[in-house]
Regions:
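Bacterial N-terminal signal peptides
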Residues: 10-20
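Structured, acidic catalytic/metal-binding patches in enzyme active sites
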Residues: 24, 32-233
Length: 233
């Protein structure tokens, strides 16, 4: 059986797009930023990664240079800040089971027990997560393992969102929060047990996989990124 692509949980397959009306050529080392131009107008497309430890900062200089030249940044989605109580409640409600159902109803006893065993490493239990749908649980597992591997971090998108807010740069978004919630809520629909069980099986590989992906991303090694993220699956 083909494994569910955990790599797609751990790194951004999507792009953050930075645009500026008038930008000259940017001389830089190879990294994951590409320029599309017509006349004096240019759009810079930056490949981003959502899990990036603090040790990976500062970012390659091209990211900063491109940001400084840009007047508008276009991100994947605007996620609610931790202080946005209404937004956080909306996410939690959209990713939780309703009508008395729980994760126990969608996974086998064996998988539920395996989840319990894994969560015991963090002083938690499967029952504490059972209110959430499998997509949310799987993403939480990846975040927890990244934290344990000392690889957790805010990521490139969040970093530039903060800079844009600080500097008063315009920000736009490709997707709505409702779309993101729906996508995550329906992740693994019909294959809930497989999603959780294979996520648990793949977590031990996360540290090495993330390190390889981050290295390829920093170097703009699209061939290696294809190998890690696309060709493998």
């Amino acid at each position: 059986m083909k494994r569910i692509p955990l790599r797609k949980w751990a790194m951004a397959a999507s792009f953050a797009i930075s645009a500026t009306a008038f930008a000259g050529n940017v001389e830089h080392d190879q990294t994951s930023v590409w320029k599309v131009s017509k006349g004096d107008d240019a759009v810079y497309v930056g490949g981003t990664i959502h899990i990036l430890p603090i040790s990976e900062f500062p970012l390659p200089a091209t990211f900063t240079e491109t940001y400084e030249k840009s007047d508008t940044l276009v991100f994947e989605v605007k996620m609610p800040a931790p202080t946005d109580i209404e937004g956080q409640q909306k996410m939690m409600a959209g990713l939780a089971y309703k009508d008395g159902k729980s994760l126990k109803d969608d996974v086998s006893e064996e998988t539920y027990q395996a989840l319990n065993v894994y969560l015991a490493n963090f002083g938690a239990t499967a029952d504490q997560l059972a209110q959430f749908k499998p997509g949310m649980v799987a993403s939480m597992l990846v975040a927890m393992e990244a934290q344990r591997s000392q690889l957790a971090g805010q990521g490139v998108d969040a970093y530039f969102m903060q800079l844009a807010a600080r500097d008063g740069k315009a920000s736009e978004y490709l997707e709505s929060l409702d779309f993101q919630i729906s996508m995550l809520a329906n992740m693994g629909a019909g294959e809930e047990d497989r999603l959780i069980s294979e996520t648990l099986e793949t977590l031990p590989e996360l540290k090495d996989m993330l390190k390889s992906t981050i290295k390829a991303w920093r170097e703009g090694n699209t061939k290696k990124i294809d190998e890690l993220v696309v060709d493998t699956f």
